[in-house]
C-alpha cells in the first residue's frame, strides 16, 4: 500500500501514515511529497485542474496522460444519423472527470489510434440529460461495440450546448473537426 507523507484518514482525519503502518495487514510505503510550480502535487490539485478543464496542467502532474477507458456500448445512433458516428462509453463512477464539455484529443482502439472529438456530459440538443462519454474518431470507420477503448481528452474546446437544430449541431461538429485536424497537423 502507498500513501503520501501528509496522508490522513478516519474520524477527524486523525489517522497518520505511522498509524496506517501499524494497522495495515500489508506493508505501507510512505512517499515523500512532490512539488510542481511551487505547489504540492496532490490528487486534490489534479482534480481541481480537471474541473477547470486544464488538461495540460493535470497531465503535467500525472505519470501518464489522463484518459478514460471503457467498453464501447450502443448509444442512440444520433451521431451516425448526422454523419458523425461516435463510440459511447458509460461514465465509470469511481473516476474523476474533467469539466463537462467538448474536447479535442485522441483515442486508442484495437484498430489503432485516431484523433478524436470527446464529449463528456449530457447531450442537450436532443433532450438527453444522462451523462455519458462519446467520441467521434476522425478517420475511423467500422464497429467497436464490445471493444475497450481509451479516450484522451487533451484540449478543452467548448461547453456542451443545446443547439436550436440538428443542422446547427452538424455545423458546429464540422468546426470542431476542422480544429481537431489543424491541431493534429502541428
What are these regions (language model features)?
Residues 2-85, 108, 164-170:
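Classical nucleotidyltransferase
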